[in-house]
């Protein structure tokens, strides 16, 4: 039986031009081209950081995993929103005779808002899939973050006052209505790293970053809002974008530009540990998570229904949701309700369940 590993990431513009960024942004918006001013802002951000190294770094990560596991698996790479696209790579895998595929998403935490976006492309009459849903608890990855933060504390912070700010990509608050485990995983991940450092709960905090302006409420506090709300600041802030593993725009701009600029304004020293990128500890984590999961059941995939229906809100999530009595209904869902000719539109399972919960599911 021919087996493969499919490593997947978000993607990035194929060229840093206005239209190159527009094409990428349009893919993110599911085929709806954003307004020109939105494209211009994102383009300017890419120019500010000198482009993005994400694809180069990811190809190196893939090659390093292949060097470790290539004798047993064919290793492939695909993006969610740029070339090579997941369906195209699956087509190549079929042509190569692959029968089983381990899907390794290069995001350590599970959120149906993000990871389910990969799962929905996993369709094949030939290949059975096994999706590794999360791998943030891998010891090698925890050690990476603890070691790199410890270096900053020892070599740069020394005896001065500091605060570690763990940040993670925000998700829409409606995700919590359906038991998305992402927030709990981020909190646990941060706690595990802090425990390795031997620090107290007062020496770190959790924030969120990189939310999109699509007309819906997102999980708070946003990292920039958190900084602005502080009445007093320590001598040092150590920013740890823990939901990411590679340098890309949401680290190089959202952290290294926006957070850095605010630190300059407040007279605080800005620090950020290097991203794992191609570090051997990250590769150890990726290889080990394959080993831990490789004997699980492979299946012909109906990912949205199966994954979504497994989710149950945690107590932490219920506490957050207690502040809002009603389901947060995004504008794009409202438009979907009003859309004419929707019988020709395949409704995503997530949206169907949201409408069902709100009592607004269109009649068949």
Swiss-Prot record:
Example GO biological process: heme biosynthetic process
Localization of this protein: Cytoplasm
Family annotation (HAMAP family): Ferrochelatase
InterPro entries: Ferrochelatase (IPR001015), Ferrochelatase_AS (IPR019772), Ferrochelatase_C (IPR033644)
EC top class, as a word: lyase
Organism field: Streptococcus pneumoniae (strain 70585)
Transmembrane intervals: none
Entries under NCBIfam families matching the protein: hemH
Role played: Involved in coproporphyrin-dependent heme b biosynthesis. Catalyzes the insertion of ferrous iron into coproporphyrin III to form Fe-coproporphyrin III.
CC annotations in GO: cytoplasm
Pathway info: Porphyrin-containing compound metabolism; protoheme biosynthesis
Keywords: Cytoplasm, Heme biosynthesis, Iron, Lyase, Metal-binding, Porphyrin biosynthesis
A Pfam cross-reference name: Ferrochelatase
Residues that hold Fe(2+) according to the record: 169, 250
EC number, as in UniProt: 4.99.1.9
Disulfide bonds: none
Family affiliation: Belongs to the ferrochelatase family.
Reactions performed catalytically: Fe-coproporphyrin III + 2 H(+) = coproporphyrin III + Fe(2+)
Main location per the UniProt record: cytoplasm
Gene: cpfC
Iron listed as a keyword: yes
Family matches, as Gene3D superfamilies: 3.40.50.1400
Protein name: Coproporphyrin III ferrochelatase
Binding of Fe-coproporphyrin III, residues: 29, 118
Domain of life: Bacteria
